[in-house]
């Protein structure tokens, strides 16, 4: 399997180590991107990705290596430390660029055959809301099977995480990896994803892009 990790930070702290720990348990074929190092642009709200083509986005070429890696991957891992109870600004800015891929707009067919994981860490709290920020995108992209893992590490860096906590993280990532590997031969969207897709198909107007094609 091919795995791509999108790190919501450029430093290699607890979130990085946990995401990488999970990835190597799934596959040896791993690509990693660090935000904002590998992509740090903000969506400018031009709406060209909705009304014309994603290729009209002023950041299309900068984003293309990550887009291609996600499209080629079997597993997408989105990882972000908690910043004020949410994802990092870099992760949010990154996800904003894929609004056009939400099921209500122009979903990418390959997403319905992928698995995705959201990982977040904090010294204390905020993992639930941070994971939701990322899970929303995985769901509305149509990613067939989704997993999440949030953990309070009670430390400001990986070296400060207790051995007891690291053992618990090791166990949790092994469990997720086993589920991903087990499910890899039978990737189908669940009822919730199928239901949302048909709602979007039946109750949304054709996009300007589709109207131009017809």
Regions found by a protein language model. Name each.
Residues 26-31, 143-144:
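A generic structural motif
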Residues 137-201:
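Active-site/pore-lining binding-face segments in mid-to-C-terminal subdomains
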Residues 203-214:
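Single conserved hydrophobic/aromatic residue that forms the stacking wall/gate
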Residues 2-25:
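N-terminal beta1-alpha1 ligand-phosphate binding loop
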């Amino acid at each position: 399997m091919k795995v791509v990790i999108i790190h919501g930070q450029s430093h290699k702290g607890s979130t990085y180590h946990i995401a990488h720990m999970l990835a190597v348990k799934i596959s040896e074929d791993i690509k990693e991107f660090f935000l904002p190092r590998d992509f740090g642009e903000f969506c400018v709200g031009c709406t060209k990705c909705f009304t014309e083509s994603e290729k009209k986005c002023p950041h299309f070429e900068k984003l293309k290596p990550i887009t291609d890696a996600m499209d080629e991957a079997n597993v997408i891992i989105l990882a972000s430390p908690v910043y004020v109870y949410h994802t990092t600004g870099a992760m949010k800015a990154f996800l904003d660029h894929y609004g056009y891929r939400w099921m209500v707009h122009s979903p990418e067919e390959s997403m319905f055959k992928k698995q995705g994981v959201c990982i977040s860490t904090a010294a204390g709290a905020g993992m639930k809301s941070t994971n939701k920020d990322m899970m929303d995108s995985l769901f509305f992209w149509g990613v067939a099977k989704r997993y999440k893992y949030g953990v309070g590490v009670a430390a400001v860096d990986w070296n400060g995480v207790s051995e007891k906590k690291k053992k618990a993280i090791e166990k949790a990532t092994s469990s997720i990896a086993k589920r991903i590997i087990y499910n890899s031969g039978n990737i189908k969207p669940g009822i919730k994803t199928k239901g949302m897709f048909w709602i979007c198909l039946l109750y949304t107007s054709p996009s300007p892009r589709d109207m131009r094609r017809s």
